[in-house]
Amino acid sequence: MITPFNLEEMTRIMIENLYKGNSRKLINKTHRQLAEHGNNLVNVGEIEYSTILEIGAGNGELFPHINQNFKKYHMTDISDWGKTEIDLICKLDERVFFEVENVENLSYSSDHFDRIIMTCVIAHLTEPFRALEELRRVIKKGGLISIFVSTDPSITLRLIRKLITNKKMKNLDIPYKLYNAIEHRNSPTSIIEMVKYVFKNDLINVEHYPFKLKYWNLSTHIIINIVKK
């Protein structure tokens, strides 16, 4: 989407704002939830010494929540706006790499990764269907894909924003509502239907949070775990 705004810079500011106060606790909780299923598979030996791909690494905020029993960890993002923080992670752990990648056209070979983790990216994409096809292409048979889906504009998410996050976003160049309207262009229902089609021959598990009710409008986010058959 073409706009007159510097959305990359506003995203950086927004993330800095989210990692302050109570919202930081909520964000870290969602990271743990996104990593949980894959970590459990590692703990029981179903995924061992894996090569991991993270889509939407940002400034590396998900990494501390990932089980550290892996062979290689590829952090990727559409730009290098968070590279300063990620470089520190790479220096401390030589198994970690950062690469600028477009999930709609990944440079990796097919059947390359054991585990793929996509942070809050799918709602932002211009070509989400193509991105899902790319994820399926580069994951190995038996590999796990974990996808974070924002439920914007759900009632629950809007309430959380009103109570906690909106007041933090006054330093953005545009209203926070407009930022989300531009960035979260793909609805949760459309994303789920695309996932069901692209991964129709695979094992799909859809979990709603913070409640277990299967209604996106009563959720703040959805996590989809897929095992390629």
Explain the meaning of each model-derived region.
Residues 1-46, 49-58:
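Conserved class I S-adenosyl-L-methionine
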Residues 24-26, 126-134, 144-229:
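S-adenosyl-L-methionine-dependent methyltransferase catalytic module, highlighting the catalytic core
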Residues 59-105:
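Class I SAM-dependent methyltransferase SAM/SAH-binding core
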Residues 64-67, 132-136:
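A structural alpha-helix within SAM-dependent methyltransferase catalytic domains
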Residues 104-116:
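A short acidic, Gly/Pro-enriched loop at the edge of an enzyme's catalytic core
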Residues 115-126:
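A short SAM/SAH-binding and catalytic strip from SAM-dependent methyltransferases
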